């Protein structure tokens, strides 16, 4: 064997690949009773990853790779991908703080269906920004605090949906049941949830964009609806703190969005009525839909409802 080589390297060169991977979970936005102000992070009982994964690796130039089950549903041009926008925002924030940017390759493993109502865009945004923050913390000795990063996720979510709301990005990033508060120094507070309940989520396979789901909402509401919304939300928050499950779920109803979005979701009303009659604590639309969620007492009931939804709601 004849090899032609240069003497450019006098010693053995070892390149250490620096990388960080972050998983961001799915979430139920609104949770029926809290339009734009409540969100719940969810984790499948079978341990599968329901969410997106972003890997950040050292590179010679910035780049984006998209893989995964739903990669083909995303824009082909990297400039149109929200993960690329997250990188631009993060780098801009670094420069504002006088920090140097290093080139990275970002790989998005898109496991979440787009337009599902399970916080698909929030998963990508949170995984991207949290991944970048973890990468810089580990290898560049710099990171943004939790509040700053949460604000970045909200900014990115607003870019997608057209309005600023944290009900998906906050639980996705912070976990648990989150209540959004009108305080920029706080943004979100965790509520005590009910750990002995099961949430069944059924994604029918159709796509409903957040913007389209918002466009069908009225620009004004009746006094009765406003009072009902405020009373139900206040009662739910109070019941969470008192751990009164029966009262909490008794007010888990949506007077703001569900009455106007039902027409976007074939078979939703039929499924809602069946599940409530069959003993579900509550049934609602996850985020802007089309995913339906219902609250169950035990795993056996949850399994039974899941089978019914598989036969009657999925398309």
Q: Where are the predicted features?
A:
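Glycine-rich, charge-dense phosphate/pyrophosphate-binding loop(s)
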Residues: 240-315
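Active-site rim beta-loop-alpha module in soluble metabolic enzymes
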Residues: 201-262
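Glycine-rich beta-alpha junction loops
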Residues: 26-28, 176, 203-208, 255-256, ...
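ATP-binding N-lobe of GHMP and related small-molecule kinases
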Residues: 2-116, 130, 134-144, 175
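Alpha/beta catalytic cores of group-transfer enzymes, especially the acyltransferase/condensing modules
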Residues: 144-196, 283-285
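Short, small-residue alpha-helix embedded
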Residues: 122-137, 289-295
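Short beta-strand-to-loop capping motifs
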Residues: 58, 204, 294-298
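Short, conserved charged micro-motifs
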Residues: 62-65, 210, 299-306
């Amino acid at each position: 064997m004849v090899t032609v080589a240069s003497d450019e390297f006098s010693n053995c060169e070892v390149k250490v690949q620096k990388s960080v991977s972050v998983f961001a979970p799915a979430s139920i936005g609104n949770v029926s009773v809290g339009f734009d102000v409540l969100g719940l992070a969810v984790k499948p009982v079978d341990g599968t990853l329901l969410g997106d994964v972003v890997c950040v690796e050292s590179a010679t130039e910035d780049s984006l790779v998209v893989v995964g089950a739903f990669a083909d549903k995303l824009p082909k041009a990297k400039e149109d991908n929200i993960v690329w926008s997250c990188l631009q925002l993060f780098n801009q924030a670094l420069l504002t703080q006088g920090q140097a940017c290093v080139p990275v390759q970002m790989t998005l493993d898109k496991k979440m269906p787009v337009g599902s109502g399970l916080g698909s865009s929030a998963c990508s945004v949170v995984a991207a920004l949290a991944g970048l923050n973890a990468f810089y913390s580990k290898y560049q000795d710099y990171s943004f605090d939790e509040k700053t990063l949460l604000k970045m996720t909200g900014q990115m979510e607003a870019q997608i949906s057209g309005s600023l709301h944290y009900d998906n990005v906050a639980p996705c990033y912070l976990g648990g049941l989150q209540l959004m508060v009108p305080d920029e120094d706080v943004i979100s507070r965790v509520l005590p949830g009910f750990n002995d309940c099961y949430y069944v989520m059924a994604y029918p396979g159709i796509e409903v964009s957040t913007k389209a789901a918002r466009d069908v909402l009225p620009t004004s509401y009746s006094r009765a609806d406003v009072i009902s919304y405020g009373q139900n939300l206040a009662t739910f928050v109070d019941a969470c703190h008192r751990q009164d499950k029966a009262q909490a779920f008794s007010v888990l109803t949506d007077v703001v969005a569900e009455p106007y979005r039902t027409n976007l979701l074939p078979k939703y009303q039929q499924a809602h009525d069946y599940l409530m009659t069959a003993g579900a604590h509550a049934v609602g639309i996850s985020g802007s839909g089309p995913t339906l969620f219902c609250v169950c007492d035990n795993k056996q009931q949850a399994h039974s409802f899941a089978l019914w939804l598989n036969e009657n709601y999925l398309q």
